[in-house]
């Protein structure tokens, strides 16, 4: 983080587009970099940009997806991964997926890279429609972005997780989940149509504990649970959730293990899934917990076998009344192979849903609604 802005500035002055994986870059420096990039007609992806796919080439944490005519712009790494993977596995394809960094749609940055990415994909003849993904943007920034969307002749899908369905231009549709965004981009195709929410076996009602490596997947799970009236607490609370309180044993706990407070001084859990081992063991042994909810994120840059690692931990625990539910974000073409990861989890007794949103819905059913 300390030297990222200086190195990015050097790259811009050499006429290059820049992707900044590093975080901990001050907001003021991010704004300055993006303003300079705009003057030079160059794009800054990031800081804290963990995912992009440019001309079919995955960068950082990204998945091997089919080429196609759907462009994606995201202030969200695992949000991009979930949507592009769902589209690809359903037979669609991606022209480009452009990460802009999680703070681009803040008031301080003003959506500079998002506007430039929209301009780029709008002018790209290989891109037929565009998906926007973000946690709730600042209202003024959202208004400006949606005004730019309305100037396009291309159809847009807008997935601002946790935001209200804003008044959208005529060429845009709102999606409340990442799965819904992928479905809309595919022309309304229903994903996971054969998946039943009815549990294989009933479990006692109780709390849900979610242990996530993906920040946006963690946010989406919180929103699904809160929408159904659950009391949800998190270290990164989404709209409708509250901050974690160690003394409150009544709330569902949905934890983002990739947040700064967990990754300072150690690898991200997508690189080292052992980051959630101890919490997983504790949750499985907690009599007040009915369901443990996990994400498994694969692809370029990720751990070689996250499902196998989780299965090893689960094998330490006697088959229990606690249900374990997961989804796998990724594709069959990824090095870890999505079907192989699913089979490993199912072999360990995990109930695997077709998407992160459906995994949260299944957890709700298993925990008694």
Regions found by a protein language model. Name each.
Residues 1-369:
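Catalytic-core regions of core metabolic enzymes
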């Amino acid at each position: 983080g300390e030297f990222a802005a200086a190195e990015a500035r050097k790259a811009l002055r050499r006429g290059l587009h820049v992707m900044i994986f590093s975080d901990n870059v001050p907001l003021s420096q991010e704004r300055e970099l993006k303003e300079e990039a705009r003057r030079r007609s160059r794009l800054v992806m990031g800081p804290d940009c963990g995912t992009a796919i440019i001309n079919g080439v995955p960068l950082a944490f990204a998945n091997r997806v089919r080429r196609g005519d759907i462009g994606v712009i995201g202030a969200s790494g695992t949000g991009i991964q979930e949507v592009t993977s769902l589209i690809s596995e359903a037979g669609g394809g991606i022209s480009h997926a452009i990460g802009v960094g999680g703070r681009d749609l803040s008031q301080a940055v003003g959506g500079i890279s998002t506007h430039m990415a929209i301009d780029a994909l709008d002018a790209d003849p290989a891109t037929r429609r565009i998906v926007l993904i973000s946690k709730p943007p600042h209202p003024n920034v959202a208004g400006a972005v949606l005004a730019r969307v309305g100037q396009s002749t291309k159809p847009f899908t807008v997935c601002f997780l946790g935001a209200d369905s804003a008044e959208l231009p005529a060429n845009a549709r709102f999606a409340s989940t990442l799965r819904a965004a992928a479905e809309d981009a595919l022309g309304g195709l229903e994903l996971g149509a054969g998946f039943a929410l009815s549990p294989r076996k009933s479990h006692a009602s109780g709390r849900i504990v979610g242990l996530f490596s993906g920040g946006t997947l963690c946010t989406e799970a919180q929103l699904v649970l809160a929408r159904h009236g659950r009391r949800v607490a998190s270290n990164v609370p989404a709209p409708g959730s509250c901050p974690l309180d160690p003394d409150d044993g009544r709330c569902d706990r949905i934890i983002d293990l990739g947040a700064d407070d967990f990754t300072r001084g150690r690898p991200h859990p997508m690189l080292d899934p052992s980051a959630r081992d101890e919490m997983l063991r504790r949750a499985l042994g907690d009599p007040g917990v009915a369901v443990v909810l996990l994400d498994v994120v694969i692809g370029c840059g990720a751990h070689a076998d996250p499902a196998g690692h989780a299965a090893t931990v689960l094998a330490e625990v006697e088959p229990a009344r606690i249900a374990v539910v997961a989804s796998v974000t990724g594709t069959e073409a990824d090095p870890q192979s999505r079907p192989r990861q699913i089979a490993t989890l199912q072999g360990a007794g995990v109930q695997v849903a077709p998407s992160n949103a459906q995994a949260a819905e299944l957890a709700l059913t298993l925990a008694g609604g």
